[in-house]
Structures are given as C-alpha cells and as structure tokens.
Amino acid sequence: LGCSEAEVGLDRRQGTARTFATLFARAQDWLRIGELIRCNGLQGDRQLVPADWIRRMEVPRNADGDYGYHIWLKAHRTRSVRGIPAAQHFMASEDFVDPDTVYLEGMHGQTVCISRRHELVALRIGRKPRHAHWDSSHLFNTLLREVSGEPAR
C-alpha cells in the first residue's frame, strides 16, 4: 500500500494488542486503507486482500445489522450504539445518501467513509466533537450530494 509505519495500542504495558481498536496511522494511510476497501482489496492490478474477505467484512454480524467485521454498515440512528449511550455524540440525523456506504470509526470520531457507487473515500480526523449534537452523517452526505449532483439539504 505504500503506508508509513503504524502502531497498534496494547491493553497494558507489555500486554496484548487491542486489535479491535487503537491502530495509530497517518491520515494518508487511513485513506489508502479506505481505498483498498473501496476497490474490494485491489490496489492497481494487485489483489492485496481477497475480494471475498472484503465482502465478508460487510455482512451484518450483530442483531441491529449495522456492524460487520470491524466495519460499520449504516449510520448510527439510535440513542444506543453498541449498547453504549455515550456514543450519542456520533449520532446521525439521516441515513447515508448512498445506502451501501460503509465506514471505519475511531475512538474520537475519526472516520473513514467509503462509497463505491460514487468512487469516494473521505476521512474525518481531529478531536472528539465537543457538543452532543455532532452529526456523523452530515459531512459525508454533503460530499456525496456534491459528487452526485443531488441538491444540498
């Protein structure tokens, strides 16, 4: 992929890798990962990840049908995400314009959104939003509407 070095956080000093979270990588590298997912594991003419594995990542694995293998399958529209009420900071006001949007979500709201239909990968990095009304779907939907020619809301 041409990525820089990255770090995986541990659960404690000299402990076990927290593979469900805490992958520290540069913004450009997160975009490369998003592009790899968008292209079903293909980089140029090389299949780096089997396309079948990418497809299996995107099969719903929980009762709500919104989570696959470490990837979110739809915008958070309920007050409890993963059973954690505090996740309301990342609520969505609407579903994604592209219903096939998938995304990776980090600890402080860092998000890699992926739309194959619109050939778009977008990254949101920065500090955790400070207000409870942060809308996790607005930014990506604004981009999707722009590239698709759909009127803004």
Regions found by a protein language model. Give the residues of each.
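Active-site helix/loop module of the DD-peptidase/beta-lactamase fold
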Residues: 1-25
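Sec/Tat-exported extracytoplasmic proteins
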Residues: 1-5, 27, 34-41, 61, ...
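Active-site Gly/Thr loop motif
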Residues: 4-10, 59-121
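Solvent-exposed loop/turn segments at secondary-structure junctions
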Residues: 13-17, 30, 37, 41, ...
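Non-transmembrane alpha-helical segments in soluble domains
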Residues: 31-38, 54, 58, 72, ...
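Structural helix-adjacent loops and short alpha-helical linkers that scaffold large soluble proteins
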Residues: 41-50
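Structured C-terminal helix/loop/strand segments within mature extracytoplasmic catalytic/sensor domains
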Residues: 101-153
